[in-house]
Design a protein with these regions (language model features):
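Active-site rim/loop-helix segments in enzyme catalytic domains that contact anionic ligands
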Residues: 1-96, 122-127
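Metal-dependent de-N-acetylase/amidase catalytic core
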Residues: 2, 69-74, 78-176
Length: 176
């Protein structure tokens, strides 16, 4: 909100509509698709942030890393970086953008679409000549602490899928 309040034009661009997210029973109205809820939430958030424009690139959500949905040719993860970057670069040029924010190269927590945001955003900024590119990152220690604290609420199957938070996995968590 600060940027808009300081007179900057804020534009939000999303790679997908988040249609692959997990949904708890009763969260959506009968027949309501998740993407529709996500778009409504996005637009409401954009208004709170004072965003002047919201755009969605024409890709579908890739789901979490390692899921079969990662292989869908229409998903953002599978989009050729150059093609997606040109679409974003066109928006950056239209807006005369001075700054672009992207995820870090690990996509925050390793989500394939967030990793792709990093790749596409970095290339788009080059193509558009956008001078400032800032990466949003997450503190590894905070992530590990949160995972430890929340593990007691997971099923055995879910715990088995978690990285080893005491050994080498913890030292290298989020680092390629």
């Amino acid at each position: 909100r600060r940027a808009a309040d300081q007179g900057h034009r804020v534009v939000l661009v999303f790679g997908t509509r988040g249609e692959m997210g997990e949904v708890q029973d009763g969260f959506l109205a009968d027949g309501e698709p998740l993407w529709q809820r996500r778009v409504a939430e996005t637009l409401a958030s954009a208004e709170i942030l004072g965003a002047a424009r919201v755009e969605f690139l024409p890709y579908i959500d890739s789901g979490m890393m390692g899921e079969p949905s990662n292989e869908d040719p229409a998903c953002f993860w599978q989009a050729p970086v150059e093609d997606a970057a040109r679409q974003l670069a066109d928006l950056l040029v239209q807006e005369s953008a001075d700054v672009l924010t992207v995820y870090d190269d690990n996509g925050g927590y390793g989500h394939p679409d967030h990793i792709q945001v990093h790749r596409v955003g970095a290339r788009a900024a080059e193509l558009a000549g956008t001078p400032g590119v800032f990466e949003a990152t997450m503190n590894r220690d905070d992530i590990i602490r949160s995972m430890r604290e929340s593990s007691e609420y997971l099923t055995e199957e879910q715990r088995a899928e978690m990285p080893d938070l005491e050994g080498e996995d913890a030292q290298n968590f989020g680092v390629d």
